[in-house]
C-alpha cells in the first residue's frame, strides 16, 4: 500500500504514548571506523589534487541493535516529530528482493531531488553544510560563515551546475538564483538553491526526471564516473542510502527526495544501519569532514534516543 500526505505529517498517538513509543537502542559498530573514514578522506583529497576528480562524496555507517525489536513506524514517528519540516518516509524494501526482503528504509530528508506539478518542475539541492550548536549566537555565526565559505560554495556549485545541465535542455525556462540561500534542519545548516522550470515535454514524468538527475554530485561526485569508481573501491554497499525516494502518479506528477538522513531496518526490527556522508573537494579538511558526518547522523540518532 502507498500513503502520501502533503504534510505536516502527524504520527499516530500509539507511537507517541503507547508501547510503540518505546525504543531501546545501542550502537554496536561502525563501517568504517571514524579513524578509517578520516584516512579515506585524506586519501580522497590527495586524489582530487592530482587527478580529474573534482568532488567526491564519501559516506560512513553506524550499526545499531534494538532490544526488544523495533517497529519501523516508531522510528518514523520520532523522525517526523523531530523534523524541522514535520516530514518523513517509510519504505518497504521487500520488492527489491534478495537480502532486502522484509527490510524497511526510514528517514526524513531535507533535500528535494525533483518535484513535478503539471508542467512546473522544481528542485532544492543541498551541498555545503555545517553542524548546529545550542548557543544561539554561536549557531547564527556558524550559519553566516557557511554562506561565505569558499570550500562550501565550490561544493554547492558542482551540484547546481549538474542540475542545470540536465534540466536546461528539458525546460523552456529555468530560474536559478545566482547565489545559494541558507537553510536549516534541527541539526544542520545547509547551502541550498531553489530551482524552478517549465517543462518542454509535458509528458515527462517526475520519475523520468529523477532518473535523469540521479546521482547528483551531492551524493556521488564529479566527474560522475571517476567518483563512482572511487566510491565503489573504498566503500561497502550503501544499500538504498543516497538513492531517491518518492512517488509518481499516473499523470506524471510527483516528488522525489534524496534518500539521506535515513536508516535501513532489518527484517524483524532487531537491527539497523544508518548512514551519513560529506562532499570532499581539494580544499577539504579531513577532521572537519568527519565532524560533518557525525552532525548529520544526529537526525537518526536522536530519533533512536541515542543522543
Give a label for each model feature.
Residues 2-35, 39-42, 46, 60-67, ...:
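Contiguous alpha-helical scaffold segments within structured protein domains
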Residues 34, 69, 284-287:
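Ordered, soluble secondary-structure elements with a strong preference for glycine-centered loop motifs
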Residues 54-55, 174:
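Residue-level detector of short coil/turn "hinge" positions at structural boundaries
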Residues 56, 88-92, 239-246:
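A short glycine-rich, hydrophobically flanked beta-strand micro-motif that places a catalytic Asp/Glu
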Residues 60-154, 158, 169-175, 252-277:
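An anion-binding catalytic pocket shared by soluble metabolic enzymes
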Residues 194-307:
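Conserved hydrophobic core element of enzyme catalytic domains
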Amino acid at each position: 500500500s502507498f500513503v502520501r500526505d502533503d504534510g505536516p505529517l502527524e504520527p499516530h498517538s500509539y507511537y507517541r504514548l503507547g508501547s510503540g513509543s518505546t525504543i531501546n537502542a545501542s550502537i554496536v559498530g561502525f563501517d568504517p571506523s571514524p579513524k578509517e573514514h578520516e584516512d579515506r578522506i585524506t586519501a580522497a583529497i590527495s586524489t582530487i589534487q592530482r587527478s580529474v576528480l573534482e568532488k567526491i562524496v564519501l559516506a560512513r555507517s553506524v550499526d545499531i541493535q534494538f532490544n526488544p525489536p523495533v517497529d519501523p513506524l516508531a522510528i518514523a514517528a520520532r523522525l517526523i516529530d523531530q523534523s524541522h519540516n514535520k516530514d518523513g518516509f517509510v519504505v518497504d524494501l521487500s520488492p527489491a528482493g534478495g537480502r532486502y526482503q522484509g527490510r524497511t528504509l526510514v528517514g526524513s530528508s531535507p533535500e528535494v531531488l525533483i518535484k513535478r506539478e503539471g508542467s512546473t518542475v522544481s528542485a532544492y539541492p543541498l551541498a555545503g553544510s555545517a553542524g548546529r550548536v545550542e548557543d544561539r549566537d554561536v549557531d547564527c555565526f556558524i550559519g553566516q560563515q557557511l554562506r561565505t565559505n569558499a570550500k562550501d560554495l565550490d561544493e554547492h556549485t558542482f551540484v547546481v551546475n549538474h542540475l542545470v545541465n540536465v534540466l536546461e535542455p528539458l525546460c523552456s525556462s529555468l530560474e536559478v538564483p545566482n547565489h545559494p540561500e541558507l537553510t536549516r534542519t534541527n541539526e544542520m545548516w545547509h547551502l541550498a538553491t531553489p530551482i524552478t522550470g517549465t517543462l518542454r515535454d509535458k509528458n515527462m514524468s517526475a520519475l523520468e526526471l529523477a532518473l535523469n538527475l540521479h546521482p547528483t554530485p551531492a551524493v556521488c561526485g564529479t566527474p560522475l564516473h571517476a567518483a563512482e569508481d572511487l566510491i565503489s573501491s573504498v566503500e561497502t554497499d550503501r544499500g538504498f542510502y543516497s538513492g531517491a525516494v518518492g512517488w509518481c502518479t499516473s499523470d506524471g506528477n510527483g516528488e522525489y527526495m534524496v534518500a539521506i538522513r535515513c536508516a535501513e531496518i532489518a527484517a524483524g526490527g532487531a537491527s539497523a544501519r544508518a548512514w551519513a556522508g560529506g562532499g570532499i573537494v581539494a580544499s577539504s579538511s579531513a577532521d572537519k569532514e568527519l565532524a560533518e558526518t557525525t552532525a548529520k547522523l544526529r537526525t537518526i540518532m536522536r530519533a533512536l534516543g541515542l543522543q
